[in-house]
From Swiss-Prot:
GO terms for cellular component: apical plasma membrane; plasma membrane; sodium channel complex. It comes from Pan troglodytes (Chimpanzee). It is a multi-pass membrane protein. GO terms for biological process: sodium ion transmembrane transport. The additional delta/SCNN1D subunit exists only in some organisms. Residues 28-41 have a biased composition (Pro residues). It catalyses: Na(+)(in) = Na(+)(out). InterPro entries: ENaC, ENaC_chordates, ENaC_CS. The lineage of its organism: Eukaryota, Metazoa, Chordata, Craniata, Vertebrata. This is Epithelial sodium channel subunit delta. It holds the Pfam family ASC. The keyword Hydrolase does not apply. Residues 1-47, 574-613 are annotated as: Disordered. PANTHER family: AMILORIDE-SENSITIVE SODIUM CHANNEL SUBUNIT DELTA, AMILORIDE-SENSITIVE SODIUM CHANNEL-RELATED.
């Protein structure tokens, strides 16, 4: 019994000593019954604003267990079976690689900015487009008439020397009177037609152009002799026309009779104010039908009908070989470029031109290169009309011509302060012009990139049907009726001097062709969501879960890193060789120092634990890590 009581006394003393040590090392507990059971976790545990797991393993386990991404739970549910865990890990890794690969392909296509064409059909009343008609008879301007006759004689000499064709028979000598104010001109006879080389069985014919010093020569060759003669003659013809005064206008209405014999629209006669006239140096007298007519119904009876007079005047037989009418359909307020988009109608026929209109809507940057008007284009338009790409290309070429050759081409408008090219003022302009024109044909000039297509454009698709007109049975009275308006009386010439043209809408329906991006932002997000759902069954919320995992991992890395730094900092005095074994201090006011003093000493000496008060949570950590666990109890018992 005595031993039992002695043992009980020792245990009570040890208990009191342990309680005393705990009271010295920890904050005193809140007042309350010491024997009360701990409260339930839900009621007693107060959740913090942000809670982190204790390790990365716990973090990853929590994510795989609760994430909405398919396959993630398989990485932790079969932890006891390493084969399944490894297999599902490899499958998840392969799915991730496939997802990244397909997303890369998707983004690559998106950055190429592909577009698709959406075609829709609309039906509404449409204004008839403009129609330009030319008779194909270029005139000889009176101020340079004698120069043109010199050109005719020089052309006959060249053709005779090449093809042994005598064109001088039946022609009188120079008969044009010398005008009072004839501009000085010297025909350059060094630029003549010649055989350049033999290309197989074909003979190339052309002419040579040299620069002002004669050191650099350019050969303009053709496989067709007709094309060579026409281009050579056209070069000299434009060279002569450049001598005309800037204010000179050709009186192209001097022809006998009228070009337009009759005109009607929807059964009503046209008015004279509905025509605009001008003269083209190559295609002769031209008329533009400029009536504001709205097509009510399709068909010939509801379109424009024209009866035209066709004359074959021998003004420039080598320059113009056309026997008929030149026709071009173009948009309103657009310049007619007859050399690019026109076609011919032969005499003695009735041609029905059916128009079908398409509206094209193009996408601008970054999907394409188009412009809404002339404001955003680098090239200044020289034509006083709406923006078209052809007008921009012509203006760009003319400006480059002025910059490179110091003069402009006669068939195009001039920039401010420039003058037209002529051998009298610019002897080597032909060499410079054809060099530049060859670069334009081979797309080596910057005009193609400087002149984008319009973002909104109307394209006209034409279909033409022809028949003999007038017919054999109706020729008598038809020609007799029209003969009163200046046609020749000979019946064999009447048919070849007439042509009838009908301009109608094939249908009032028109197609609208609109460009749309293949991958707009909503479509790109939809494609990305489809791929994520295919490989992982993921959604936007699943991506937010991944983002949360990354944030938690970053925060846990910072916390664990800070804890390691604190441990290393507090363990540094223990690693000091002068510090002795750690002893337990029963009370904070009686803690001995290595020098034999107490904790009441103001400044303890020697390499021992410094007395540092840390704020916040770090103070508790430092106090907790400064004690040596259960070892003080054993020390007191001894």
């Amino acid at each position: 019994m005595a031993e039992h009581r002695s043992m009980d006394g020792r245990m009570e003393a040890a208990t009191r000593g342990g309680s005393h040590l705990q009271a010295a090392a920890q904050t005193p507990p809140r007042p309350g019954p010491p024997s009360a059971p701990p409260p339930p976790p839900k009621e007693g545990h107060q959740e913090g604003l942000v809670e982190l797991p204790a390790s990365f393993r716990e973090l990853l386990t929590f994510f795989c267990t609760n994430a909405t991404i398919h396959g993630a739970i398989r990485l932790v549910c079969s932890r006891g079976n390493r084969l399944k865990t490894t297999s599902w890990g490899l499958l998840s890794l392969g799915a991730l690689v496939a997802l990244c690969w397909q997303l890369g392909l998707l983004f690559e296509r998106h950055w190429h900015r592909p577009v698709l064409m959406a075609v829709s059909v609309h039906s509404e009343r449409k204004l008839l487009p403009l129609v330009t008609l030319c008779d194909g008879n270029p005139r000889r301007p009176s101020p340079v008439l004698r120069h043109l006759e010199l050109l005719d004689e020089f052309a006959r000499e060249n053709i005779d020397s090449l093809y042994n064709v005598n064109l001088s028979q039946g022609r009188a000598a120079l008969s044009a009177p010398v005008p009072r104010h004839e501009p000085p001109f010297h025909l350059d006879r060094e630029i003549r037609l010649q055989r350049l080389s033999h290309s197989g069985s074909r003979v190339r014919v052309g002419f040579r152009l040299c620069n002002s010093t004669g050191g650099d020569c350019f050969y303009r060759g053709y496989t067709s002799g007709v094309a060579a003669v026409q281009d050579w003659c056209h070069f000299h013809y434009v060279d002569i026309l450049a001598l005309l005064p800037a204010a000179w206008e050709d009186s192209h209405g001097s022809q006998d009779g009228h070009f337009v014999l009759s005109c009607s629209y929807d059964g009503l006669d046209c008015q004279a104010r509905q025509f605009r006239t001008f003269h083209h140096p190559t295609y002769g007298s031209c008329y533009t039908v400029d009536g504001v007519w709205t097509a009510q119904r399709p068909g010939i009876t509801h379109g424009v009908g024209l009866v035209l007079r066709v004359e074959q005047q021998p003004h420039l037989p080598l320059l113009s070989t056309l026997a008929g009418i030149r026709v071009m359909v173009h948009g309103r307020n657009h310049t007619p470029f007859l050399g690019h988009h026109s076609f011919s109608v032969r005499p003695g026929t009735e041609a029905t031109i059916s128009i079908r209109e398409d509206e094209v809507h193009r996408l601008g940057s970054p999907y394409g290169h188009c412009t809404a008007g002339a404001e955003g284009v680098e090239v200044e338009l020289l034509h006083n009309t709406s923006y078209t790409r052809q007008a921009c290309l012509v203006s760009c070429f003319q400006q480059l011509m002025v910059e490179t050759c110091s003069c402009g081409y006669y068939l195009h408008p001039l920039p401010a302060g420039a003058e037209y090219c002529s051998s009298a003022r610019h002897p080597a302009w032909g060499h410079c012009f054809y060099r530049l024109y060859q670069d334009l044909e081979t797309h080596r000039l910057p005009c193609t990139s400087r002149c984008p297509r319009p973002c909104r454009e109307s394209a006209f698709k034409l279909s033409t049907g022809t028949s003999r007109w007038p017919s054999a049975k109706s020729a008598g009275w038809t020609l007799a009726t029209l003969g009163e308006q200046g046609l020749p009386r000979q019946s064999h010439r009447q048919r070849s001097s007439l042509a009838k043209i009908n301009i109608v809408y094939q249908e009032l329906n028109y197609r609208s062709v609109e460009e749309a991006p293949v991958y707009s932002v909503p479509q790109l997000l939809s494609a990305m969501g489809s791929l994520c759902s295919l490989w992982f069954g993921a959604s936007v919320l699943s991506l937010l879960e991944l983002l949360e995992l990354l944030l938690d991992a970053s925060a846990l890395t910072l916390v664990l890193g800070g804890r390691r730094l604190r441990r290393a900092w507090f363990s540094w005095p223990r690693a000091s060789p002068a510090s002795g074994a750690s002893s337990i201090k029963p009370e904070a006011s009686q803690m001995p120092t290595p020098a034999g003093g107490t904790s009441d000493d103001p400044e303890p000496s020697g390499p021992h634990l410094p007395r540092v008060m840390l704020p916040g949570v770090l103070a508790g950590v430092s106090a907790e890590e400064s004690w040596a666990g259960p070892q003080p109890l054993e020390t007191l018992d001894t």
